[in-house]
Design a protein with these regions (language model features):
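Extracytoplasmic small-molecule ligand-binding "clamshell" domains
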Residues: 24-101, 176, 239-240, 250, ...
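Alpha-to-beta junction loops
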Residues: 36-37, 74-75, 92-100, 142-143, ...
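Periplasmic-binding protein-like
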Residues: 42, 118-126, 207-245, 262-278
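Short helix-initiation/N-cap motifs at beta->coil->alpha
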Residues: 62, 77-88, 132, 170-185, ...
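Extended ligand-binding regions for polar small-molecule ligands
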Residues: 62-71, 130, 137-151, 226-265
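Acidic, polar ligand-binding/catalytic clefts
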Residues: 66, 70, 75-138, 276-277
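Ligand-binding cleft/hinge of the Venus flytrap
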Residues: 66-72, 152-176, 206-210
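A ligand-binding cleft/hinge motif common to bilobed small-molecule-binding domains
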Residues: 84-88, 102-110, 154-160, 186-221
């Protein structure tokens, strides 16, 4: 009986071995260099920001990428730039992936493949001192700021068309900024009544400037956040999908979700290209 059990276990190991090796296979250049270059847009806590004391990049995305890199035996090297620069950086081959608050949405999928790893969506926020803005429809006819190159301008327009225009109210005026800090500055200066950012950023947004902000209404969109890879790089995509599964299975993903207060964004299905249009 013992020999039968051993034989069964050996057969199972042989069946699993090709999958494991294949799952961790890396493109030849990365296998040789042990370096994966990732596009990054800092200033979007809690996903990626710079520690004010050390200037080091920290955040959920940084920790999760490091955990996956450890599984694959590689090192992540970041190229920090504006949000709208990330897409051309990946398309031109200057980086190997994007993992920086990047939504998996249909209009991006003709160019990229996504590994989904967080629930996400858009949320209005404003200053606590904006007493005349009590509900989201108070933004009809007012200016709202958000990130350039994101899906939020489209989400705001859809929401405005349904909740403002159809109700006979003037539409929301959308302006865009190159990064989150600029959006906050525009609101503080009174050039915009509110902003739209991700659900994942709301806890840290509300705490900024001595808890000077508040979320406004319900989320205006829902989708999934993903790591983006070029369509011609399925080997690297599959390697990171394997690594993410391992990090979820061993509990490190849950630990990082708790550390960065992203419980409402947890997503453990490791799906490919499944984000709905926000």
């Amino acid at each position: 009986m013992r020999r039968i059990k051993i034989a069964t276990l050996c057969a199972a190991a042989l069946l699993l071995a090709p999958f494991t090796v294949q799952a961790q296979k890396l493109p030849p250049d990365i296998a040789a260099s042990k370096i994966v270059r990732a596009a990054l847009n800092t200033g979007y806590a809690p996903l990626e920001t710079r520690d004010p004391k050390t200037s080091e990049v920290v955040g959920f995305d940084i920790d999760l990428a490091a955990a996956m890199a450890k599984v694959l035996g590689v090192k992540i090297e970041y190229q920090d730039g504006s949000f709208e620069q990330m897409t051309p950086s990946l398309q031109s081959g200057r980086v190997d992936l994007i993992m920086s608050g990047f939504y998996d949405i249909p209009r991006r999928r003709p160019f990229f493949d996504f590994i989904d790893y967080l629930r996400a969506g858009g949320q209005f926020y404003t200053l606590k001192s904006n007493a005349d803005i009590k509900v989201a429809t108070d933004l009809c006819g007012q200016t709202v700021t958000t990130g350039r190159g994101t899906s939020y301008p489209d989400s705001i327009k859809k929401w405005s068309d349904k909740n403002c225009v159809e109700a006979g109210k003037p539409p929301i005026i959308v302006i865009t900024q190159t990064d989150f800090a600029q959006s906050l500055s525009v609101i503080q200066q009174g050039r915009a009544a509110a902003g739209v950012s991700g659900l994942e950023a709301m806890p840290s947004t509300i705490e900024r400037d001595n808890n000077g902000y508040r979320a406004l209404g319900e989320p205006i969109s829902f989708t999934l956040m993903g790591m983006a890879f070029t369509k011609d790089d399925p080997t690297l995509r599959d390697a990171f999908a394997y690594a993410l599964k391992q990090v979820i299975a061993d509990g490190r993903y849950a630990t990082l979700i708790k550390k960065w207060r992203l419980d409402f964004c947890s997503y453990t299905e490791v799906s490919i290209n499944q984000g709905p249009a926000p």
